[in-house]
Amino acid sequence: MQKRVISGILALVLVLTLTLTLAQADVRVELDGIDGGSASVTVPEDDSAALLEGYLYQLNGLEAPETVVKAEGGGNTASRPATYMASMNPTLRAVYDQLVPEIQKIAAGQGSSSAFSLGIQMTFTKEELGIEGDMLVRGDDGQYHFSEETGAAIEKAVNEVMDMDMLLNQLLAHHPYELYWFDKSFSEGAIRVKYSYGTDGQQTVMVGDFVIMMAVSQDYAVTDAATQQYYLYSPDTAKTGAASAAAATAAQVVAENQGKGAYSKLVAYREYITKAVDYNFDVANTANYPYGDPWQLIYVFDGDDTTNVVCEGYSKAFKYLCDLTWTGSDPEVVCYLPTGTMDGEDHMWNIVSIGGVNYLTDITNCDSYADGTAAIGYPDQMFLCGAAGGVDEGYTVDILGQRKVLYTYDDKGTKSIYDDRELVLSATKYSPLTFDLNQLIALARYAAGITTDESAAIDVNNDGIISAADLTAMAQSLVS
């Protein structure tokens, strides 16, 4: 409710009070002050999942993967942080600078309120507001009130300075991943400003008590266990803190395997994931269950054996560990995240590129379960395996002693993101190279030009050239 009642003439200031009240499906913050401007944007339904993934990558100093940032990726997308800052008026820039650290605290699980009080004051003269009549008029109750002309003029002046559309756009452009918890499409104003004002007489208006409120997505808000209603401006620190904890755990997994060779690292990551979680059959059996659950990646690293995942969690966790391990412009191993179908059922898996060759990897189907059963590819029949077929018709994996499984790529979520070089698969299973020390020495002598003995000309990485790259590949294989 907007209250513009001023009791008395001197030092007339509205009092701002903040109360939280439960309402159907959400919580409203009621402010005994002026409801100023607001802004919202339209986003894909699963955008919050992409932003959370981006935040997990950002926490460990990495750029988000292509499946997060490419707009063609089936809706599960987000933009990379912008590098160019649009021009804002000094007051709005001050608001922006105050909000950024508060947003970062919430993202890290350290902030429990998304209603931020600002230490900002504005003063307007009657002339600046363009008011021709009296600012204060006596009402039927005998009290003085701001005139309608004055109220409209103040609202216009404040909104020109506190441009919510500009503020929201700049926050989303420069801190997209840290705003994974923010409900940017909330219909009643994802970001809103409240304020109060008063006057010292008939010539000057003082505006203050500014509060910026940012709506919290239901996935990350404090929720009443009995009613399942949630508080719109109360982040649940247990939920928002889970992202930082998961990122730290994943980094620890990588650190613990740092001294191993490439193949041994991949095996260790597979074993970690399959021990950390089981397949969530309850979720998988839910009709039309969509990709984009923001918790799938976190569940693998939360240390809780009651939180399990579907294929999305297995494959994204494996890619995350690979991306944390192999960085730079020319990584030894690259992990991709295709979506499509497995024998006609929606599925997500991995492609691992190692030594310039791509191998199908399905961690989901390499798992065993607490009840003693196991997936069709347990323990490693669908790990860096061979597959026959092609990009358009799909690839078939022959599981010895069982059956053949057909994988097909999704046009929008996979073929539009990756090219054929990344989707063409090896027909044979990856085999770790095994060499002895004499072969390593012989190849080193050949690569260095010390000898021309062709018996040492081993094309280790299968690139058609005998070079120092083969020496590197052989050395790496010796520690795998």
Label every model-predicted segment.
Residues L16-G33, P331:
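Sec-dependent signal peptide cleavage junction
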Residues S234-G303:
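Secondary-structure boundary elements
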Residues E312-E393:
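Hydrophobic/aromatic-rich core segments of domains that either
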Residues Y269, D293, T306-C322:
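Active-site nucleophilic cysteine motif
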